[in-house]
Amino acid sequence: HFIIRQPSPSHTLGGGLVIDPRPARRWRRFRPETISRLETLSHGTPAEIWLQALSRDEPATVRTVHERSGLADSLAQAAYLEAWQGGDAVLLGAATEPTPEALVISRGGWSQISARLSAILDETHRAYPLRAGMPKGELKSRLDQGRAAPLTPRAFNELLGYAEGAGVLQVSEAAVRRAGHTVTFTPAQQALVKRQLAAFQQQPYTPPSAAQQRYPSGP
């Protein structure tokens, strides 16, 4: 709570309640999502307050969300356990227990990131159908757009691991692709590949030049 007083002559000008003393971003007034968030922080259960703190910037470590929530340590831990056991919070990575440094994401946050990953990869496969996948660095850069802060390398890698386990995508050493995506040639491309392979077999020690591969009958 806070009170604004005039020192001389002594007079109380007003006062109020600070709902979120450490906001991670600016919120636009009068928007339904802003009002709903403030109502949760003001009157919600500890689990609702904890999940609201998580949603500011996720995924995050359990310790970080505890600190954001403003709840007492024991109350924050109980709130997290309630959210986790109820399926509203998901552990990432290899963590199976809610340790302080475990990364966690809300069910709603995961749905949003999963949909964004799928959309980015689908768009990439449409634009570059002959590529096996999207470079990890490029995918992270796209995923960071619009976020309050970039994903840490650990958070990004653990999100990819969770997404792969959920059947959303597949990860190789350097690239990421949608689950089930394979490079497929058009009939014209397949015919060209067949001609080039035949040319290599006919002249294994003097393979065709790049120009001859592009123009089989000569430039």
Question: Positions of the model-derived regions?
Answer:
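C-terminal effector modules of nucleic-acid-centric enzymes and ribosome-associated factors
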Residues: 1-219
